[in-house]
């Protein structure tokens, strides 16, 4: 073989090795690329206990029960299925019934999702109270221009405080 042919074979071999490596990495990550699963997907797939994943949906109205030692149970729904969730810890300020939520954790044998982390989702119109106050103070707040009312202050337990 000439020098040019050897160089082409070398480049082709390196390209094939990189393509195989990339394919293996993508195949290994295929189960973790999904941002979250809905309660309907969990019901269809019958996830085994102990498998970690992210659960996303809305906090079902009337399902939040606060227990001792920061224990909270609630249900996540996608309006087609519901999944009970157990969480121990402080909830985000935006957590409330009817609000979007993403919980990370694993299924327990009884069909309850045990969350280690709970994230509250909000839409693009949410504005923290501190930002709204700063805009009002600087004179840039435009009343009635589509800005939502600022979120009420909350205690460490997530309860709304009286203004």
From Swiss-Prot:
The lineage of its organism: Bacteria, Pseudomonadati, Pseudomonadota, Alphaproteobacteria, Hyphomicrobiales. It is found in: Cell inner membrane. Residues 134-163 are annotated as: Disordered. The chain crosses the membrane at residues 8-28. One of its GO terms (cellular component) is plasma membrane. Residues 29-163 are periplasmic. Belongs to the CcmE/CycJ family. Heme chaperone required for the biogenesis of c-type cytochromes. Transiently binds heme delivered by CcmC and transfers the heme to apo-cytochromes in a process facilitated by CcmF and CcmH. Its main location: membrane. GO terms for biological process: cytochrome complex assembly. This is Cytochrome c-type biogenesis protein CcmE. Residues 1-7 are cytoplasmic. It is a single-pass type II membrane protein. GO terms for molecular function: heme binding; metal ion binding. Keywords: Cell inner membrane, Cell membrane, Cytochrome c-type biogenesis, Heme, Iron, Membrane, Metal-binding, Signal-anchor, Transmembrane, Transmembrane helix. Heme binds at residues 122, 126. InterPro entries: CcmE (IPR004329), CcmE-like_sf (IPR036127), NA-bd_OB-fold (IPR012340). Pfam families: CcmE (PF03100).
């Amino acid at each position: 073989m000439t020098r040019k042919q050897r160089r082409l074979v070398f480049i082709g071999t390196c390209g094939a090795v990189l393509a195989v490596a990339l394919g293996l990495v993508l195949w290994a990550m295929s189960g973790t690329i999904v941002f979250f699963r809905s309660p309907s997907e969990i019901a269809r797939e019958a996830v085994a206990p102990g498998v970690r994943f992210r659960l996303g949906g809305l906090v079902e109205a009337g399902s939040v029960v606060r227990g001792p030692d920061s224990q909270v149970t609630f249900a996540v729904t996608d309006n087609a299925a519901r999944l009970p969730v157990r969480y121990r810890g402080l909830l985000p300020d935006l957590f409330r019934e009817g609000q979007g939520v993403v919980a990370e954790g694993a299924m327990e044998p009884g069909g309850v999702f045990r969350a280690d982390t709970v994230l509250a989702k909000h839409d693009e119109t949410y504005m923290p109270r501190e930002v709204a106050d700063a805009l009002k103070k600087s004179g840039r707040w435009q009343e009635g221009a589509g800005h939502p009312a600022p979120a009420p202050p909350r205690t460490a337990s997530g309860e709304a405080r009286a203004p």
